[in-house]
């Protein structure tokens, strides 16, 4: 709904915001990547891999990632599963994620939140105690 130039400008601004957030704050997971705020997925995933940030594979919003699957996998980033369940009947339902993993040959050792693999998160105690410095 906007010009190509405007779209590219928005993608650049959004991408820079994601990169800055990962550098400045103890981010653990990027959720809904490319769902509403379009970004350069490859660049964001490369930074996420570098910073130890998971990228969510969201049951409801996988369509936003389909065309970027190869770049995401090639970046080396780890993934975490999210069902986006807004209904208790949908909790734990990951069939679309399983299909995505199979379709794009996502290495299962890099997918957390399934197969009993729990993600690990950064300790935020020091960050919280020193938040005024940020």
Where do the language-model regions lie?
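Active-site-adjacent beta->alpha loops and helix N-cap segments on the catalytic face
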Residues: 37-44, 64-68, 91-95
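Short, motif-level signal for alpha-helix interfacial/capping segments enriched in acidic residues
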Residues: 9-11, 59-76, 125
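Short acidic/histidine-rich active-site segments
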Residues: 77-92
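Catalytic core of soluble alpha/beta enzymes
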Residues: 90-92, 98, 109-116
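Active-site beta-loop-alpha junctions enriched in small/polar residues
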Residues: 1-4, 33-36, 58-62, 84-88, ...
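Hydrophobic faces of well-ordered beta-strands that scaffold small-molecule active sites
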Residues: 29-31, 55-57, 79-83
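Short basic/hydrophobic patches in alpha-helices and adjacent helix-turn junctions
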Residues: 71-74, 78, 99, 103
């Amino acid at each position: 709904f906007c010009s190509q130039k405007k779209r590219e400008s928005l993608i650049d601004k959004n991408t820079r915001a994601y990169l800055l957030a990962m550098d400045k704050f103890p981010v653990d997971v990027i959720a809904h990547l490319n769902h509403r705020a379009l970004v350069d997925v490859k660049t964001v995933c490369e930074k996420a891999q570098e910073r130890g940030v998971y990228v969510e594979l969201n049951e409801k919003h996988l369509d936003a990632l389909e065309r970027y699957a190869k770049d995401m996998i090639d970046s080396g980033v780890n993934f975490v599963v999210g069902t986006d369940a807004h209904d208790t009947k949908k909790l734990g339902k990951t069939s679309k994620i399983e299909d995505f993993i199979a379709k794009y040959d996502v290495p299962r050792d890099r997918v957390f939140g399934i197969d009993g693999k729990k993600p690990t998160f950064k300790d935020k105690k020091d960050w919280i105690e020193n938040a005024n410095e940020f």
